[in-house]
Amino acid sequence: MNLVLMGLPGAGKGTQAERIVDDYGIPHISTGDMFRAAMKEETQLGLEAKSFIDKGELVPDEVTIGIVRERLGKNDCEQGFLLDGFPRTVAQAEALEDILKDLGRTIDYVINIKVDKDALMERLTGRRICKNCGATYHLVFNPPAKENVCDKCGGELYQRADDNAETVSTRLEVNLKQTEPLLNFYSEKGYLANIDGAKHINDVYADIKDLLGGLNK
């Protein structure tokens, strides 16, 4: 079961990823985790990636793709994997096709959790955090009993700067522009499966399980 998981910020990707890997016993492979593991193991590619990250620069595609190749070649990926955060561009998607071809495998599905921008705005701008204990609330989905007061410690709640409407809107627009060519690429390949992420978390996962039901565990 070889899967790629996509979705805009706030679509609920993380929650669904946890359920998929728990149920199907495949590793959840995120770009960040791959970089951290490669750097910890001090592989040649890991050290190259570290040199860019330490300077605050983007890791070049050739290094990222090399790290992905190393990771997908490990034993725990023999029964499949869930890729999250890679690929981000069509060039990376084409490189992934080459990697899998060399391994004698193909992608089964690219699962795209779709939520419209207005709903994502509501989800992302509604978050509030306690200044004192760090507890997280949501004005719509998980509000505190008393407005702007933490239920746990009585601390004041605040909105992070990057959760304000203008910043969130810009972030979503950037992500939309980046992912559209990738979604088109996978749609043309026949891998793309759009899942309605506006539903309740359990219903979203039920749809994913229905999709994966035809694949061998």
Curated annotation (Swiss-Prot):
GO cellular component entries: cytoplasm
Catalysed reaction(s)? AMP + ATP = 2 ADP
Name the InterPro entries on file: Adenyl_kin_sub, Adenylat/UMP-CMP_kin, Adenylat_kinase_CS, Adenylate_kinase_lid-dom, P-loop_NTPase
- The annotated region (NMP) lies at 30-59
Listed transmembrane segments? none
In which residues is AMP bound? T31, R36, E57, L58, V59, G85, F86, P87, R88, Q92, R160, R171
Pathway(s) it belongs to: Purine metabolism; AMP biosynthesis via salvage pathway; AMP from ADP: step 1/1
Return the broad EC class. transferase
Which Gene Ontology biological process is one annotated for this entry? AMP salvage
UniProt keyword list: ATP-binding, Cytoplasm, Kinase, Metal-binding, Nucleotide biosynthesis, Nucleotide-binding, Transferase, Zinc
Report the GO molecular function annotations.
Answer: adenylate kinase activity; ATP binding; zinc ion binding
What are the boundaries of the region LID?
Answer: 126-163
Query: Where, subcellularly, is it found?
Result: Cytoplasm
Binding residues for Zn(2+): C130, C133, C150, C153
* Enzyme Commission numbers on file: 2.7.4.3
Record: residues binding ATP: G10, A11, G12, K13, G14, T15, R127, T136, Y137, K199
Per its UniProt record, what SUPFAM superfamilies does this chain match? Answer: P-loop containing nucleoside triphosphate hydrolases
Q: How does it assemble?
A: Monomer.
Family under the similarity heading: Belongs to the adenylate kinase family.
According to its UniProt entry, the function of this protein is described as: Catalyzes the reversible transfer of the terminal phosphate group between ATP and AMP. Plays an important role in cellular energy homeostasis and in adenine nucleotide metabolism.
What UniProt notes about the protein's domains is: Consists of three domains, a large central CORE domain and two small peripheral domains, NMPbind and LID, which undergo movements during catalysis. The LID domain closes over the site of phosphoryl transfer upon ATP binding. Assembling and dissambling the active center during each catalytic cycle provides an effective means to prevent ATP hydrolysis. Some bacteria have evolved a zinc-coordinating structure that stabilizes the LID domain.
- Can you name this protein? Adenylate kinase
Organism annotation: Bacillus pumilus (strain SAFR-032)
